[in-house]
Amino acid sequence: MNDRMVVYQKPTCSKCRETLALMRESGAEFDAVNYYEQPLTVERLRELIDKLGVPARDVLRRDEPLARGLKLGEGGLSDDELIKIMVENPDLIQRPIVVRGDEAVLCRPPEKVKRLL
């Protein structure tokens, strides 16, 4: 397993900052990717969701005004459709997502990162 982790995050997100702090405290080596400055592609987000082992709907921030306005939490859209919408609107992506090798964890709460440390 590759020891270096990758954190997909938004720097202003409190859960992202807490996760990064836990990783630093553990001495883990990682790269932080601000997916607002380095946007995710459809392919990359699909890969992350596959590593998480969940449907795309589980990575959707349903409480975001845009998600509520588009009624994205109500179902009816395929994973591919949801992924495309999330890539176009990164505020809709749950964060942070931490990847180590073939494993990924959605760190909500931040303590979930300990599974990869």
Task: Enumerate the predicted regions with their spans.
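A contiguous, well-structured "functional interface" segment within a domain
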Residues: 1-13, 96, 104, 115-116
